[in-house]
Amino acid sequence: MTQSNPNEQNVELNRTSLYWGLLLIXVLAVLFSNYFFN
């Protein structure tokens, strides 16, 4: 993990993809909870 090359775009892309993944997991968790509670 050398910081000789500033990959700010890659870090920002990974961060946004991580946030989208967490949002998707949350949405799926809500959908599954509603499906199981019905």
UniProtKB/Swiss-Prot annotation:
Keyword Transmembrane applies: yes
Record's subunit section: PSII is composed of 1 copy each of membrane proteins PsbA, PsbB, PsbC, PsbD, PsbE, PsbF, PsbH, PsbI, PsbJ, PsbK, PsbL, PsbM, PsbT, PsbX, PsbY, PsbZ, Psb30/Ycf12, at least 3 peripheral proteins of the oxygen-evolving complex and a large number of cofactors. It forms dimeric complexes.
Membrane topology term: Single-pass membrane protein
Cellular location(s): Plastid, Chloroplast thylakoid membrane
InterPro entries listed in its UniProt record: PSII_PsbL (IPR003372), PSII_PsbL_sf (IPR037266)
Annotated source species: Allium textile
Source lineage: Eukaryota, Viridiplantae, Streptophyta, Embryophyta, Tracheophyta
Protein's name in the database: Photosystem II reaction center protein L
Gene Ontology annotations of biological process type: photosynthesis
One Pfam assignment: PsbL
Family classification: Belongs to the PsbL family.
SUPFAM superfamilies, per database record: Photosystem II reaction center protein L, PsbL (SSF161017)
Cellular component GO terms held in the UniProt record: chloroplast thylakoid membrane; photosystem II reaction center
Keywords, in A-Z order: Chloroplast, Membrane, Photosynthesis, Photosystem II, Plastid, Reaction center, Thylakoid, Transmembrane, Transmembrane helix
Chief location category: plastid
Entry's transmembrane regions: 17-37
Function noted in UniProt: One of the components of the core complex of photosystem II (PSII). PSII is a light-driven water:plastoquinone oxidoreductase that uses light energy to abstract electrons from H(2)O, generating O(2) and a proton gradient subsequently used for ATP formation. It consists of a core antenna complex that captures photons, and an electron transfer chain that converts photonic excitation into a charge separation. This subunit is found at the monomer-monomer interface and is required for correct PSII assembly and/or dimerization.
